């Protein structure tokens, strides 16, 4: 006898499937987001080391860089951002091909050389520039973190943030 004769849909998400079948069963594109430190400060050890960076109000982006060339620039949701030729050229000039295949995690922010926009205006102008067709001129990329491509895909780094910061980010500021 047939008990169920209908197709049933499910609301099972990728996080549950990855929990059941193992991390990476379904690849998830994700980046770490900032959070208010007040809620977590009590969980840190007294001698814990952490970094504080300025809030920029730009657009989070991931740059895939491989042997001297930018492969892609994506939003934090994984959507490719086009029209950043000038920025791509700047990144390729600034970063050595010796770094191999890496991911740069940072924030896109339209340059405000005259310092005339409020934070909100700058955010709005950056968003407008990114979302329109054509080339985006005057776009900057502020790097928060950098790690090897394979480690980004695995979601685990062999180095601490402090070590990555020393290895990569200091090199970029030269």
Predicted region positions:
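Charged, flexible boundary elements
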Residues: 23-54
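Short, charged/polar low-complexity linear motifs in solvent-exposed/disordered segments
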Residues: 16-19, 27, 89-92
């Amino acid at each position: 006898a047939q008990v169920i004769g209908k197709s049933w849909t499910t609301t099972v998400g990728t996080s549950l499937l990855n929990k059941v079948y193992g991390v990476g069963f379904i690849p998830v594109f994700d980046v770490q987001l900032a959070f208010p430190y007040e809620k977590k400060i009590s969980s840190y050890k007294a001698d814990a080391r952490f970094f504080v960076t300025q809030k920029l109000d730009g657009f989070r982006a991931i740059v895939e860089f491989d042997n001297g060339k930018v492969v892609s620039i994506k939003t934090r949701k994984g959507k490719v951002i086009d029209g950043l030729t000038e920025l791509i050229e700047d990144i390729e000039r600034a970063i050595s091909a010796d770094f191999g295949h890496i991911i740069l995690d940072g924030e896109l922010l339209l340059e405000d050389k005259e310092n005339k926009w409020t934070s909100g205006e700058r955010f709005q102008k950056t968003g407008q520039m990114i979302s329109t067709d054509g080339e985006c001129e005057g776009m900057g990329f502020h790097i928060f973190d950098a790690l090897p491509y394979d480690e980004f895909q695995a979601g685990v780094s062999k180095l601490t943030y402090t070590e990555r910061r020393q290895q990569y980010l200091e090199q970029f500021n030269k």
